[in-house]
């Protein structure tokens, strides 16, 4: 079977899987976690559920997918993204300023810039009527930015209720770490760029320059909250392209191209579906055709009969980092997240093969 012929059925199954999951708000992508009460966490010993961040990223990826094709499927994916944007809007915090917290019922966990960036980007692209909800969180985040122009990951508003502010600051000091994280800032500035690139031009320009300066000598970007360098580098490289830092973007792409495993995919120790999908989407238009074919063949080999891909490590938390000594690394993965990245990657390859590709054409190729 030719590459063109293989893409259509795989894309069709992946899209159907994501549409079905999206009808219920992507429940498989809800991150569930318990925190130990012995560590002094008030919200410990009960299960906390993150229902906003990963589904918002998935919905944004569906907008990417729709942008890469036309036809009925693209319209359905935009509708799924729109419904998810409505869910995100309803989940905005009401007990403290700052927007969204990854685990909203955990008192020690502040609202965060990554969740805010995901909300901004999704609202801007799928449901602009919700953009007024993010005006105040953006103001707070930018007001607390470092001299470099990069905001800190945790958004603790000066006018938050005193008790809540005390708990959040304690959580940051002892558990989460008070950091500026390039990959988180990249998502935030990509969100501002999608929302209003003219209005936020000075802030985006300063932030992008600082992120370009944070690039490692080899071309990759470090990531605090994601496993391995692939996703953080992809986010930062996307911002570099959007803001005209072409040399930094090309260095990042070149570094990822060199990091491919002999099997044809990407991953920290071996090729895995998630990293392969992320890298392939970024490099689909620049890799040699034979390298694209190997990566696609590998990615397709991982697809499940129901159209999904098995999850591989995505989000990470380094336990002890806040106190200067990482004791262990907790990771989380999701089949639905991996499938959304894989769908985007396959569509990027299909677009390279046929710039006028539609899902209907892919299915009959």
Give the positions of each predicted feature.
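Preference for long, amphipathic alpha-helical scaffolds in soluble/luminal domains
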Residues: 1-365
């Amino acid at each position: 079977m030719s590459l063109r012929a293989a893409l259509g059925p795989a894309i069709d199954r992946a899209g159907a899987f994501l549409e079905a999951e999206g009808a219920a708000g992507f429940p498989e992508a809800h991150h569930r976690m318990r925190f130990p009460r012995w560590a002094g966490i008030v919200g410990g010993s009960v299960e906390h559920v993150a229902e906003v961040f990963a589904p918002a990223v998935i919905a944004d990826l569906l907008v990417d997918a729709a942008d890469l094709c036309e036809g009925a499927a693209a319209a359905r994916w935009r509708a799924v993204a729109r419904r998810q944007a409505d869910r995100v809007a309803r989940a905005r915090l009401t007990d403290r300023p700052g927007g969204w917290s990854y685990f909203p019922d955990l008192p020690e966990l502040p609202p965060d810039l990554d969740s805010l960036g995901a909300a901004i980007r999704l609202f801007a692209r799928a449901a602009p009527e919700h953009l007024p909800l993010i005006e105040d969180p953006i103001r707070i985040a930018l007001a607390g930015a470092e001299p470099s122009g990069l905001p800190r990951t945790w958004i603790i508003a000066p006018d938050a209720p005193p008790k809540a502010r005390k708990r959040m600051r304690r959580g940051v000091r002892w558990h989460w770490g008070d950091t500026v994280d390039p990959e988180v800032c990249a998502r935030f500035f990509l969100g501002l760029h999608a929302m209003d690139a003219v209005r936020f031009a000075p802030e985006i320009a300063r932030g992008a320059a600082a992120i370009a300066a944070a690039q490692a000598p080899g071309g990759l970007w470090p990531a605090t909250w994601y496993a391995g360098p692939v996703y953080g580098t992809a986010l930062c490289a996307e911002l570099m392209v959007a803001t005209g830092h072409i040399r930094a973007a090309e260095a990042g792409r070149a570094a990822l191209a060199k990091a491919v495993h002999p099997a044809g995919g990407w991953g920290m120790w071996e090729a895995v579906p998630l990293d392969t999908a992320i890298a392939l989407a970024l490099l689909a238009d620049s890799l040699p055709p034979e390298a694209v074919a190997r990566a696609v063949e590998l990615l397709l080999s991982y697809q499940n009969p129901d159209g999904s891909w098995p999850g591989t490590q995505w989000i990470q938390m380094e336990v002890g980092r806040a106190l200067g000594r990482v004791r262990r690394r907790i990771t989380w993965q999701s089949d639905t997240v991996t499938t959304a990245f894989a769908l985007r990657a396959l569509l990027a390859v299909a677009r390279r093969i046929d710039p006028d590709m539609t899902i209907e054409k892919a299915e009959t190729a």
